[in-house]
Design a protein with these regions (language model features):
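Short alpha-helical "recognition helix" segments of helix-turn-helix
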Residues: 293-298
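Structured, helix-rich domain cores that form ligand/interaction pockets
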Residues: 1-289, 317-335
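Residues in the helix-turn-helix
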Residues: 306
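Residues in the recognition helix of alpha-helical DNA-binding motifs
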Residues: 310-313
Length: 335
């Protein structure tokens, strides 16, 4: 398995005025988004630069502050064309090039605001795992879907809108997201996402892990205040942040897959106490037909605190698909 780390997208946000956004609307082709009944709050999108890596969102309000948001795909912006799988690794040199291209786009749409006035509103820490087969992507996606949720995090399915039930079920089948108030974590099949959303086909089998940090979390993690310096600082911490998050999910990079029979053999031959072995066997057997580790904990009737401790020590997880008898064990049990 090959891993590739970097930045997929980030967003910049700055305060504006009603009249300034009105001038931008006059000069550019805008797509109208949601608005309230009396048009006191309106949302617009400038999609002319989306293929080049920048989507511009305008929030125009008579009763609240108005905002301009830039959603930036830095790899596409620097390449001047859409890069579906490339991840950005910022350096001081590439950041200068990035700011130059952003300044050019802002001048073209008629926004005179300095780039320094923008704030980093969202940052996506991204890790792409490359597998040899699509079945491996589905297998690991199922493992994540069955993982133990951390406190204050909740699963966030795709909203059911005007799309058909088939598309809605397909989206939730190929992606999994959990979130709290300040960050969200998504795992999804990148090839499926590109095919369905962007009509782009790729040969690579990629499982994308994406940790999205909000403005609140960014301010806690960064000592710098300028958005360009924050990008550099966050990128330096990215590996440690992602590894820490995966560790909290009890799914570190060191985890490996074994069969159901192998799992029982590992438990039997380990140096664990007989009482612990008995509980681990119960967990493995109950995991065979449960949809999540939370359901396993209820069926085994092991105390929640003890169950979490055992997950931390032994990192047991099982694939969601019953026909695929795989159990992932961490190095602690296998040692």
């Amino acid at each position: 398995m090959k891993c590739n780390d970097g930045i997929h997208t980030f967003s910049l946000k700055t305060r504006s005025s009603y009249s300034e956004i009105q001038n931008i609307r006059v000069q550019n082709a805008c797509i109208r988004g949601k608005r309230d009944l009396f048009s006191l709050n309106q949302n617009f999108c400038i999609a002319d630069y989306k293929d080049k890596g920048v989507e511009i969102l305008l929030h125009q309000s008579l009763v609240h502050p108005s905002w301009v948001t830039l959603i930036v795909n830095p790899s596409s912006l620097l390449a001047d064309e859409y890069q579906p799988t490339e991840l950005f690794r910022p350096t001081e040199q590439t950041m200068k090039q990035l700011k130059t291209r952003l300044r050019t786009i802002l001048d073209e749409i008629g926004l005179a605001t300095r780039l320094k006035a923008f704030r980093l509103a969202r940052y996506n820490q991204t890790r792409d795992r490359y597998y040899n087969h699509a079945s491996e992507v589905a297998l690991w996606l199922g493992i994540f879907q069955k993982s133990w949720l951390m406190p204050r995090y909740a699963a966030v399915p795709f909203p059911k809108d005007s799309e058909s039930d088939v598309k809605w079920k397909g989206a939730n089948q190929h992606a999994w997201t959990i979130a709290n108030k300040s960050c969200a974590f998504s795992v999804y099949d990148k090839a499926y996402e590109l095919k369905k959303r962007h009509k782009v086909k790729i040969k690579a089998h990629i499982l994308r892990l994406e940790l999205r940090l909000s403005r609140k979390r960014i301010r806690k993690l960064c000592h710098e205040t300028d958005w360009d310096k924050q990008l550099l600082e966050l990128h330096e911490k990215q590996d440690a942040q992602l590894d820490k998050f995966l560790h909290r999910l009890h799914l570190p990079e060191s985890i490996r897959l074994v069969t159901f029979t192998q799992a029982l053999e590992i438990i039997d031959t380990s140096r664990l106490r007989e009482k612990t072995k008995k509980k681990l066997r119960r967990i493995v057997k109950k995991a065979n037909g449960c949809e999540s580790l939370a359901a396993v904990q209820k069926k085994t009737r092991i105390k929640k605190s003890e169950f979490i401790t055992m997950l931390g020590q032994h990192r047991i997880i099982r694939q969601k698909e019953p026909s695929c008898q795989h159990i992932a064990f961490g190095r602690t049990v296998c040692a």
